[in-house]
Amino acid sequence: MQSLWIYPEDTEVLGAACKSLLKALKPRYQKIALFSPISGGCEGFGECESLSSLEVHSAIDKQKALELVSTAQEELLFETILKRYDELQSTHDFVINLGYAPKFFLNALLDLNTILAKHLNAPVVAVAQTSLDHLKAMHSHILKKEAPFAIGLFVGETLEKPHFLSASLCKQQCELEASAIENLLQTKSEIITPLAFQRSLEKKAKKQIKKVVLPESEDERILKAAHRLNLMGAVGLILLGDKEAINSQAKNLNLNLENVEIINPNTSHYREEFAKSLYELRKSKGLSEQEAERLALDKTYFATMLVHLGYAHAMVSGVNHTTAETIRPALQIIKTKPGVSLVSSVFLMCLDTQVFVFGDCAIIPNPSPKELAEIATTSAQTAKQFNIAPKVALLSYATGNSAQGEMIDKINEALTIVQKLDPQLEIDGPLQFDASIDKGVAKKKMPNSQVAGQASVFIFPDLNAGNIAYKAVQRSAKAVAIGPILQGLNKPINDLSRGALVEDIVNTVLISAIQAQDY
């Protein structure tokens, strides 16, 4: 589904612009929607006769939007808009997003246009009657507003390229040149904001509902996350604990757990089955029947057994337990996938306009070349699960052949192993971080690399580097760090930080459900 965001910098020329746009769209698309995210702000669009046959859809009225902004609830405003936009996407082939003229809200209007367009991943098209120099200045302003995706100016040519191919649009013109419209429709925006990525997780999880068990129901963060997930309807949920106590706490917190299954390990009919199964699995390791019965009452082991025996599809734990306490039962019971020798982790780093994969940042302290290669291949597979095309950079303090040493040898060996295991995977190294992400630096340091300058998956040489890096990016760039996401297990078990926020828990549960779709 395609879309454009029209910014009416000059409302007097909207008629000509809209007429030309619809003339090009109607032969190509049967279902075209007009979307004004905040109603009452589309000044000038109402006078465009060519749009009169199309219904205008909105997400929220202006007064409510102002209330949310004035009370610092912008994220709720954008979530409301994204939800309505997703509904339109499912029923239409093309969405024309109607932007806001400079008088709307009487403040930072271009910011509103570019912020919303970023969340909707829609190229911005500015309709203007002005000089070429002014248009160039306007484009520069858009770029300074951190919206590099805002690449269209509806004046005969898009601004995807650094030069202009034609002059300004005169008010008297009845329509734009066909070539300008054609160029415009070829414009693509490939950005994703943290909010849009989180929405995509919800949509992906809903395609195939999976059941996730949360053993730490004594923590109100878990209950609040369960409430949000319950309203979302994207996953099935199991909470472990005393039903009466959980419902009482939920009532005190004004939470809705109506569709959430609650199991008490102490009284569950699964108790005997789990004890027997645990004993059979671990008796060769010296586990006695009495110890198996005791472990079956432990919430983490009980939750792991629910997943192992197929009563749940995934488990999320860790707000009140260490990583070792979460992973140990999984390693003992669920074990690793065939051909995989270790469990590693990645973080999905949601920056302003893109999502990167960082690994390993939580599990393996000092991976060998073989382990580093395995982390790289499993991280690439994880990236694919979340629609991130993997271009893998093996990171180091040096790029290419610019240095020698034990670390460089380790990365070169890991690269050779990966290339033998998966010849189709786009991977390169050693690469410094700037060479892996910046095309200008890459052109100088690794001009023949297919990965340098455009990496999406970043593999750190050890846990020290990985953990420091993800926290540095999270804090300094205000990125949303989703994870750690465990990879390599036979079934999804994921660990939470003990400082996890409700939003972190929601994201991890959605990711676990999505992982379970591949099992």
UniProtKB/Swiss-Prot annotation:
Domain of life: Bacteria
Catalyzed reaction equations: acetyl-CoA + phosphate = acetyl phosphate + CoA
EC number in record: 2.3.1.8
Biological processes per GO annotation: acetyl-CoA biosynthetic process
Span list, region Phosphate acetyltransferase: 196-519
Pathway where it operates: Metabolic intermediate biosynthesis; acetyl-CoA biosynthesis; acetyl-CoA from acetate: step 2/2
Name of the top EC class for this enzyme: transferase
Keyword terms: Acyltransferase, Cytoplasm, Transferase
A Pfam family: PTA_PTB
Compartment(s) of residence: Cytoplasm
Family from the record: In the N-terminal section; belongs to the CobB/CobQ family.
Protein name per Swiss-Prot or TrEMBL: Phosphate acetyltransferase
Lineage: Bacteria, Pseudomonadati, Campylobacterota, Epsilonproteobacteria, Campylobacterales
Gene name of this polypeptide: pta
